Amino acid sequence: VNKFTDAAGNNNSAATQFTWTYDNVNPTLASSSPADNATGVAVDANIVLTFSENVAKGSGNITLYKADSTLVQTIDVNSGLVTVSGTGVTINPTANLDSAQGYYLHIAATAFDDAVGNSYAGISNSSTLNFISVDTVNPTLLSTSPADNATGVAVGANIVFTFSEAVKAGSGDFKLYRSDNTLLEDLDVTSGAVTFSGATVTVNPAADLTSLTGYYMKVEATAVDDLTGNSYAGINDATSLNFTAADVAAPTLSSSSPADNATGVAVGANIALTFNENVAAGSGNITLKKSSDNSTVQAMAVGGGNISISGAVVTINPTANLDSSQGYYVQVDATAIDDTSGNSFAGINDTTTLNFTAADVVAPILSSTSPTD
């Protein structure tokens, strides 16, 4: 404007120029903490928004959602949970974030204004400001193989731990004890005996387990971590993971009646075999033979009436009595006698392991006299 003229046509005495500046630019979001797509955000962190210019509170809500769109909290911009200082806005949710949880933020379009009343456009989608909180939860043990209190565990079995999340080696040991508290193996988590795959840890002891022996495992509290570094609490007792190895030992013959090489055996005597553990009938025969010519006196099926089993004792009752002063031996098929776990007695297949001689029960007779009758 160069001049002003009044109603009578008079101009102002000097030419003056006036300039007006209009602010019609809305504030924009310059940055945020946490940043969009941030991970590992502290669960107690505030949310800080930094704008392109100084802002003040307007009206409306700031809304925090979980990644699945579950509403976490609606915060009135004029509440004490929102503070404004220059270009910065700090939002302090009432509760801490959940561990390892995804979130996103909505902001009403009228929530923040610049000094002349231009409003920030707001956020109304799930992608402009989203983030994931840090994992603060320790991994837990879901299952083991063998399970706690398991019996019949294969002597060559590995010990497998399955956790609630993917894990990695920390520092420390897995320890295998016998049930009498003898430490058998101390396995460092970084050794080749311990392998990690996802949520699974496999422990491979150097030596096989011993038949029918009890064991338990301990795990140091720093040995297993999740991928964020939270540690599994560990096992420090003898009961949380204990198990018993399978019976893989075949029964053995402890004694017999008659004993090997016995003489003067009663001709009507039964033959009793006593084993080192309880046994049961398998399949096959127990055979009585003469020593003189290896002829078979009787082959008796273990499931037949000539053989009875009680606990660790097998009693053989031949159909006929022994011959007076006759030598005999007993043979047992390798599948004939089993223990209660199905392990078979090795059997007897020779002429010397169990041989004996029957008593002389024949009265002498007069062959001749001198002088003759």
Describe the residue ranges of each PLM region.
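Short beta-strand segments enriched for Tyr within beta-sheet-rich domains
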Residues: 1, 51, 101-107, 163, ...
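Short, surface-exposed alpha-helix to beta-strand junction/turn motifs within ectodomains of secreted
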Residues: 43-82, 110-113, 155-194, 222-228, ...
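Short strand-edge motifs at loop-to-beta-strand transitions and within beta-strands
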Residues: 87-89, 129, 199-201, 241, ...
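Acidic, Ser/Thr/Gly/Pro-rich low-complexity segments and short DxT(G/T)-type signature motifs
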Residues: 1-40, 63-64, 97-99, 109-152, ...
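Signal that preferentially marks extracellular ectodomain short beta-strand elements
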Residues: 89-102, 201-214, 314-327
